[in-house]
């Protein structure tokens, strides 16, 4: 994997920086693990915009990724190849199990074709293996962490993502996330050893607006250049300031305002990610 700065043959390529991984599979994805993915463009069934700045972009299939990895315990597996996934920042790996079934998983850092993998409590502590947190040594770097046993990985799934297992106390373990938050997780929740691969993803430079549109992302218009009917910052004769503290189009404070409202799981957060 390497960062490649393109030659300035056009304005769009002048500042472009690409992540090149020669180990990725160049052919078609594994067809049985593909599903149709329809363009929703941020609209609901009424046609109303529910998520702004979405629309257009290249067509692509959804790759069915196994985030649970709990029904192949003890069955030896081998990484067949690494693939690009347009639906996420991390790369995925096509894994062949000894019983003949193939599945996609999130590729961990250092994973290569031909690597042996194992799921389950008896799996060795080696990058890419998946096992319950009760069987993982304290201090281990982990990724694809479950929040609820059997629900599937929900935390540390993006490119370069990871968490650290800090402690185990009774039925719960403490996990430190990249944000600095320390969270309690049941010891029967599963996690994968190591970090998520494609860690250089954050260093890429898109280079031009068109490449962002290929990804289905539409322009973000500043509220201060809108009309008053469209945004609280809008209006005024000529170029004017917002006239108030920054807010969203619906009046919610935009800078530093905490919006977490799930009090039911507050007891699972040992240390908040906020500094104060």
Swiss-Prot record:
PANTHER family: LARGE RIBOSOMAL SUBUNIT PROTEIN UL2M, RIBOSOMAL PROTEIN L2. InterPro entries: NA-bd_OB-fold, Rib_uL2_dom2, Ribosomal_uL2, Ribosomal_uL2_bac/org-type, Ribosomal_uL2_C, Ribosomal_uL2_CS, Ribosomal_uL2_dom3, Ribosomal_uL2_RNA-bd_dom. This is Large ribosomal subunit protein uL2. The lineage of its organism: Bacteria, Pseudomonadati, Pseudomonadota, Betaproteobacteria, Burkholderiales. One of the primary rRNA binding proteins. Required for association of the 30S and 50S subunits to form the 70S ribosome, for tRNA binding and peptide bond formation. It has been suggested to have peptidyltransferase activity; this is somewhat controversial. Makes several contacts with the 16S rRNA in the 70S ribosome. Residues 37-59, 225-276 are annotated as: Disordered. It comes from Cupriavidus pinatubonensis (strain JMP 134 / LMG 1197). GO terms for molecular function: rRNA binding; structural constituent of ribosome; transferase activity. GO terms for biological process: cytoplasmic translation. Keywords: Ribonucleoprotein, Ribosomal protein, RNA-binding, rRNA-binding. GO terms for cellular component: large ribosomal subunit.
């Amino acid at each position: 994997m390497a960062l490649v700065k393109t030659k300035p043959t056009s304005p769009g390529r002048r500042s472009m920086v690409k992540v090149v991984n020669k180990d990725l599979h160049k052919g078609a994805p594994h067809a049985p693990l593909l599903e149709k993915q329809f363009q929703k463009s941020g609209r609901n069934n009424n046609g109303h915009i529910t998520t702004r700045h979405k629309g257009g972009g290249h067509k692509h299939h959804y790759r069915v990724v196994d985030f649970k990895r709990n029904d192949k315990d003890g069955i030896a597996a081998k990484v067949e190849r690494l693939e690009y996934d347009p639906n996420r920042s991390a790369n995925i790996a096509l894994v062949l199990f000894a019983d003949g079934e193939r599945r996609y998983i999130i590729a961990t850092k250092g994973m290569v074709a031909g690597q042996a993998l194992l799921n389950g409590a008896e799996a060795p502590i080696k990058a890419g293996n998946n096992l319950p947190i009760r069987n993982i040594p304290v201090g281990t770097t982990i990724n694809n962490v479950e929040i609820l046993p059997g629900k599937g990985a929900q935390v540390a799934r993006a490119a370069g993502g990871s968490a650290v297992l800090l402690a185990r106390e009774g039925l719960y373990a403490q996990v430190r996330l990249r944000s600095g938050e320390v969270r309690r997780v049941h010891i029967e929740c599963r996690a994968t050893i190591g970090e998520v691969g494609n860690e250089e993803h954050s260093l890429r430079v898109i280079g031009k607006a068109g490449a962002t549109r290929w990804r289905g992302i539409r322009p973000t218009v500043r509220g201060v250049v809108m009309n008053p009917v469209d945004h609280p910052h809008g209006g005024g004769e000529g170029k004017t300031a917002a006239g108030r503290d920054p807010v969203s189009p619906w009046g919610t404070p935009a800078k530093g305002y905490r919006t977490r409202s799930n009090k039911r799981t507050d007891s699972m957060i040992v240390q908040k990610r906020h500094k104060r």
